[in-house]
């Protein structure tokens, strides 16, 4: 059964805390969302710390393929938070970043509203003309066109459409 996660960060930290405690590792304090904290001085946070492990994620283009083909809403939410974290502004900065990109493409408010990354919020909206404008920009730019097409599930072959349209003219 699938459920939506209202706050992926808080869900993760609570799950991590629970898993650590179940493994017999004591964890002090409550699990909280980082957006609930006041912004600390990064330099003072790093004093006395050393890196234990480091992981480089896949390229964004590969993450987008997985996100779109399999409809990974948590990935979409995480990307919106990541966009916002560049400015240290969380989801609010992410919404503004997406809105700014769309404005650069000629798609401005009130024709679009970004409430979350997955598109599941009832407060997201996009007019038909705004969607056409976005698709037109993507179509005219060879880089964006190639990347976008790569992310779409193929009927009867992969992603959320892998079991649909098999044996029909729509397959492939």
Spell out what each predicted region is.
Residues 1-147:
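A small/polar active-site loop signature that marks catalytic segments
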Residues 40-44, 104, 154-164:
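Short, mixed-charge aromatic SLiMs
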Residues 50-54, 163-172:
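Short, Gly/Ser/Thr-enriched beta-strand-loop segments that form substrate-interacting elements
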Residues 144-159, 167-168:
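Active/binding-pocket-proximal capping segment
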């Amino acid at each position: 059964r699938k459920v939506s996660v209202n706050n992926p960060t808080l869900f993760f930290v609570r799950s991590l805390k629970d898993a650590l405690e179940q493994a017999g590792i004591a964890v002090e304090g409550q699990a909280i969302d980082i957006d609930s904290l006041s912004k600390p001085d990064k330099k003072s946070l790093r004093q006395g710390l050393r890196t234990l492990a480091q992981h480089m994620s896949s390229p964004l283009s590969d993450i987008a393929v997985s996100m779109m083909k399999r409809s990974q809403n948590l990935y979409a939410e995480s990307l919106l938070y990541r966009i916002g974290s560049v400015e240290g502004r969380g989801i609010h900065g992410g919404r503004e970043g997406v809105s700014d990109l769309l404005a650069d493409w000629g798609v401005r408010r009130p024709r679009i509203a970004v409430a979350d990354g997955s598109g599941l919020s009832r407060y997201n909206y996009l007019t038909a003309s705004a969607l056409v404008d976005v698709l037109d920009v993507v179509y005219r730019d060879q880089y964006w066109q190639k990347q976008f097409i790569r992310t779409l599930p193929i009927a009867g072959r992969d992603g959320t459409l892998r079991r649909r349209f098999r044996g029909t003219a729509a397959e492939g």
